[in-house]
């Protein structure tokens, strides 16, 4: 039976091997938090988390309560940290599902009932100016230290960790070092006074590679585990996702004929075109129209005409093909497939956004 539906191939072995490569860079006592928010950057949070569990990962980062519940309902073990903000009315549910929350504002604790036992990581804002207790200058440290002391005395709060997040670890070394030094000042004071705040963590994928001094007790790994290295550091990782459409139709176009909405492409000679069942509703941006190569049977093929909601068109004039062959949108560069960073560059965006844009109509298929 021929299945022509587009899909994203999720290579679990690549994911596990990527994590093992990252582990090899860390001291033995440094843990990894697998970042699986936003459906594991579009890869499928449940399958990715199960794979991480299989190789001993015990910490997971999600953005919302619902994402955490999904993992628990699929038997994911270990700590699940909600990196975003939950609603006060969700506190009881978070406790019921054994989820740890991020604390960025003391006023949130007004909604914690005396009989509750809430697990938290304290987030410190050292320069990103988003969530977290403000500590972007040395003269803020006393206030944050005293806040932590008070939290330690709060009977229904269990501090499981303390962390910060770098604003530009992949590109701004000086600012990252500034953030690291601020956070380290606080951590040193906590340690000198023998205050247990659980796991200390600061590094994302980029800073894990570029700033080993900031590994602390744990590193938070997202993009790198999915096979994308946006730094200059050398590490062997492979893409986990390949996005594939299907050649659903072919036709001959005469010189002078136009293709697609807006007539943005006019054939200069007779060409053979292929219709592929992916469009901007599936996350293949219109901005790639007439501006990118995809891969058909190991050969680069140009996207021509404007990408529409449900289909796109490629020039297959000089290709060997048959109907219902797969067309790779992005995947493994070693297989001559377009890498996702090239797609992101053409869109003037980041790989994260490209991953997260791949829609629900593109079914995820796990391979090993």
Where are these regions (language model features)?
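Short secondary-structure boundary/capping segments within folded domains
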Residues: 24-26, 41, 265
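Glycine-rich phosphate/diphosphate-binding loops that line cofactor/substrate pockets in enzymes
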Residues: 19-30
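Active-site-proximal beta-alpha core segment in soluble small-molecule metabolic enzymes
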Residues: 2, 6-9, 16, 30-201
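Active-site anion/phosphate-binding pocket segments in diverse small-molecule metabolic enzymes
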Residues: 2-11, 16, 67, 86-88, ...
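A broad structural signal for alpha-helix termini and local helix breaks/kinks
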Residues: 26, 75-76, 358
């Amino acid at each position: 039976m021929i299945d022509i539906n587009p899909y994203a191939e999720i290579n679990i072995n690549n994911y596990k091997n990527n994590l093992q490569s990252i582990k090899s860079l860390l001291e033995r006592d440094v843990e990894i938090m697998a970042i699986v928010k936003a459906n594991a950057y579009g890869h499928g949070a449940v399958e990715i988390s199960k794979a991480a569990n299989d190789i001993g990962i015990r910490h997971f980062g999600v953005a919302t309560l619902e994402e955490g519940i999904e993992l628990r309902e699929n038997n994911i073990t270990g700590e699940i940290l909600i990196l975003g903000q939950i609603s006060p009315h969700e506190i009881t549910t978070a406790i019921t599902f054994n989820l740890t929350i991020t604390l960025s504002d003391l006023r949130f604790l007004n909604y914690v009932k005396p009989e509750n036992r809430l697990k938290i990581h304290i987030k410190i804002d050292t320069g990103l100016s988003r969530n977290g207790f403000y500590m972007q200058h040395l003269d803020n440290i006393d206030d944050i230290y005293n806040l932590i002391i008070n939290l330690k005395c709060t009977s229904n709060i269990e501090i499981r960790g303390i962390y910060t997040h770098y604003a530009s670890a992949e590109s701004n070394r000086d600012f990252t070092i500034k953030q690291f030094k601020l956070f380290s000042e606080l951590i040193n004071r906590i340690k000198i006074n023998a205050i247990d705040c659980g796991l200390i963590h600061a590094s994302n994928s980029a800073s894990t590679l570029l700033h080993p001094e900031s590994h602390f007790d744990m590193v938070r790994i997202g993009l790198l585990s999915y096979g994308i290295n946006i730094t200059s550091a050398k590490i062997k990782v492979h893409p986990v996702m390949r996005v594939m459409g299907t050649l659903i139709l072919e036709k001959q176009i005469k010189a002078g004929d136009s293709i697609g909405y807006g007539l943005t492409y006019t054939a200069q000679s007779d060409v053979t075109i292929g219709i592929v069942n992916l469009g901007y509703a599936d996350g293949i941006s219109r901005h790639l129209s007439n501006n990118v190569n995809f891969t058909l049977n190991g050969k680069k093929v140009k996207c021509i005409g404007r990408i529409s909601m449900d289909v796109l068109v490629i020039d297959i004039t000089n290709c060997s093909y048959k109907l219902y062959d797969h067309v790779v949108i992005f995947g493994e560069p070693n297989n001559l497939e377009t890498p996702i960073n090239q797609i992101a560059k053409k869109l003037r965006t980041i790989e994260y956004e490209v991953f997260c844009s791949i829609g629900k109509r593109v079914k995820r298929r796990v391979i090993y």
